[in-house]
C-alpha cells in the first residue's frame, strides 16, 4: 500500500502530471464554494430550506457540509501533493494529522447519512409517535454523537501513518506492520462503509415497503406518508447516500483487493488507485449540487444571499401586492355566500368619498370574521 500510494508521476510532461493537479484543483474549488454556500444558506434566519416545520434535516445537511468542507480544506491539497511531488515536504505532524482528518470526516459523513435515513424512516413509519423524538435538540445530540464515534473510530490513524527516509527523500507512508494495517483497513471498511450503507439501505427499503403495502382504511394516511417520503428532502438525502456509496465503494474495494487479491504494482493499478481517490474526494463537492436541484426553496434562499436577487424578489412581491389590490371580485353576491370566490374576511365596503355621478368608490378591506 505504501509503495503504490507514493509512486510519483512518471515525468512532468506525462498526462498524469497535468491531470492530477487539475482534477484536485477542481475538487477543491467546487467543494469550497459549494459547501460554503450551503452553510451560508442554512445559517440564514428563517424557516427550513425544505419547508418542513420542525425539520431536523437542515441540521444533518449542515453537519455534512461541515465535514465535507473540513475534508476539502485540510486533506485534498496534501493528497494532491502526494501524487504530484516526489517527496513529502510538510513534516511528520502534518502527515499524521491529514490522514486522521481524512478518516474522521469520512466516518462523520457516513454516520450522518445513517442517522438521516433512520430519521426519514421514523417520520414516515411513525409520524406521530416519533414527533417528540425528532426534535432539533435531539438532532444536535445525534450530531454530537456522530462526531464522537467518528473520533473514536479514526483515532488509530493518528499513529498509522508516519514519515520515513528513502534516500534523500522523506515520504509519508503507513508505519504499521502488515497484520495491523490489514486489520485496521478491514475494520474501517466494515464500520465506515459497510455498516452505514447497510443501515441506509434497510431504512429506505423498509420505508418504501411500508408505503407500497399500506392499503385499506389507512389509505389516506399512507398517501400522505408517501408524499412526505418522496418529498424534496427525502429524495435529496437518498441521492446523497447513493452518491456516497458509489463514490467511496471503489476506494474500499481496491484496499480489500490489495490485501486479499492479486494487486501487482503497475501503471494500470496505480491509475486505478488514483481514480478511486479522485472519485472518493469528488463526493465532497457533489452534495451542494444535489441540494440545489432538489429544492426550489433552497434555491430561493440561495438567491437571497445576493443583493440583486433579493431586490428582484422584493420588487416582484410589491408588484404582486399592487396587482392584488387592483383586483375586482367577479361575484356580485354578498361576501361569504356560497358562490362567492372572494377569500373569507374580505368584503366590499364603501369609502366616504363619492365620485362624480353619485357613484361610490369601492375598495377591498380586510375584516375579521363576523
Swiss-Prot record:
Gene3D superfamilies: Rhodopsin 7-helix transmembrane proteins (1.20.1070.10). Residues 42-57, 119-138, 206-236, 281-370 are cytoplasmic. A lipid is attached at residue 308 (S-palmitoyl cysteine). Its main location: membrane. The chain crosses the membrane at residues 21-41, 58-78, 97-118, 139-159, 185-205, 237-257, 260-280. Glycans are attached at residue 6. One of its GO terms (biological process) is positive regulation of transcription by RNA polymerase II. InterPro entries: Galanin_rcpt, Galnin_3_rcpt, GPCR_Rhodpsn, GPCR_Rhodpsn_7TM. One of its GO terms (cellular component) is non-motile cilium. Residues 328-370 are annotated as: Disordered. It is a multi-pass membrane protein. Receptor for the hormone galanin and spexin-1. This is Galanin receptor type 3. It comes from Mus musculus. The lineage of its organism: Eukaryota, Metazoa, Chordata, Craniata, Vertebrata.
